Amino acid sequence: MNPSKLEQNLSGVIVEMALKLGLNHAPLSLNYPCASLGRMLGVEADPQALKPALEAFFAARAGLYGAVHVEPHEDGFCLAIPAEGVARVVAQAPAAAFLRDLIQTAQTPGATADDLLAAFRRHSDRVHVEPAGNDEFDLLVYFEDGVPDDFRYCIDQHDGFASYHRFSREDYEAFGF
């Protein structure tokens, strides 16, 4: 089992959701497909293997996340993070400043892809940008050295504004964009 990938992913998703919703001290419920959880934990992507792995993961990190409830949901699991866990993760997350900047930029009326790229470049000189090469998105963007995070950001410019979607590297590759 490789828990660090799930820990990094959860940290990024919790911070992003808390910042977008403005709820740094509220519980969050996050739904993950079994395939993503299996890739992140390095275990078989079936519910019988994942449930005990998730319970062990959160038991070992109760000081950070609190008492997380792990429940089956459709083709994956719902991870219910209590308010105190959300607050601790947001306070400790190294990528919070970048995400705050990116979210504020994306929420600015008329924000363009260039505006979003500028947010990346305010936080690193090692920003990789390439055409996405698919019909879903215009650009693929990520930090070459994984700092401040290792997510893959897909930027789409449409209807006069730009938006982004964020994926773990493994999920991005598995989706085959």
Model-derived regions, located:
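Short glycine-rich, basic-tinged beta-strand/loop micro-motifs
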Residues: 24-43, 98-106
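A cross-family detector of function-defining hotspots
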Residues: 114-152
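Charge-enriched amphipathic alpha-helical scaffolds
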Residues: 28, 38-67
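A short, surface-exposed beta-strand/turn
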Residues: 149-162
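Positively charged, polyanion-binding regions of nucleic-acid-associated proteins
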Residues: 2-30
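Charged low-complexity interaction tracts in eukaryotic proteins
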Residues: 60-92, 161
